[in-house]
């Protein structure tokens, strides 16, 4: 038994860099109980933030969580080490169809393991929107991207995500342009559209809107499906009659996949694999999905999930809605730079 005890002591730590509001309530505590490995946990709320750290080369992390369309470029830049599947006994639990989709960004699924997936759309306060716009439900991006609507909504508060990568494709797609355009003229059009509504945006932030929707501080937010789900759950818990809903507008929204990857500079590679393998247990990821309101790639988790959540169309959209979504492609660095400049203009309103 002596060697075992040493093994546990040496189990050490795993440094995790994940999206905000994106893990189960007890996942980290449970992981430490089960493995003896101590998780050290930090959060970010945009792909741009994570990419900046990864491409600078010294991350200090062992597990990071990029989105599908950023992954390919990061792999090519040598940001990750290959996953050792012999250390992932639970790998077979993953949905083969989803793994196949991810091969577009990670040929042979060598560097990344799917974590959760979701959509971008609009979260809103049902009663306030009815009062201000006179509609029972939101079904179009026009609510956020047309001046006449935004003028009215400014009185109850509107938030946009603080990310070129999340917002510009949504505007382009709404305008009938290619959401994955490489044409500078398209981004100019999207930028002009956004500058017109810019005066009515309360703030740009990619996570604060959860609590602000829940407590009635804002009435509409461009946001991630599960974050709006969490706002709705918090509002219901508070019992103050704030009624939150989520819409994937008829023009479509972004469908994305977030993955687990191990940075090149990870010094706790075994522990990183242990954490990833832990998340591949159906009962573990079921609890994560139940808490954060994002879909998971683990079919074995379906029956273990809270069925009201598993059947919630905001969490698992039906095929007809999925058909309207678009997936972001990996864009050339020069288009990414253009988007970043464009976004800075929108935010400063100049």
Residue ranges, per PLM feature:
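Early extracytoplasmic/lumenal segment of secretory-pathway proteins
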Residues: 11-74
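Hinge/lid segment of periplasmic solute-binding proteins
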Residues: 72-119, 136-145
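Ligand-binding "clamshell"
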Residues: 75-83, 100-101, 106-110, 200, ...
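Short beta-strand->loop
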Residues: 81-92, 142, 238-254, 263-265
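A bilobed periplasmic-binding-protein/Venus flytrap-type ligand-binding module shared by bacterial periplasmic
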Residues: 123-128, 172-176, 256-268, 287
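Ligand-binding pocket segment of bilobal, Venus flytrap-like solute-binding proteins
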Residues: 152, 156-245
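Conserved C-terminal helix/tail region of periplasmic/extracytoplasmic solute-binding proteins
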Residues: 211, 319-350
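Mature extracytoplasmic/periplasmic domains
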Residues: 258, 263-324
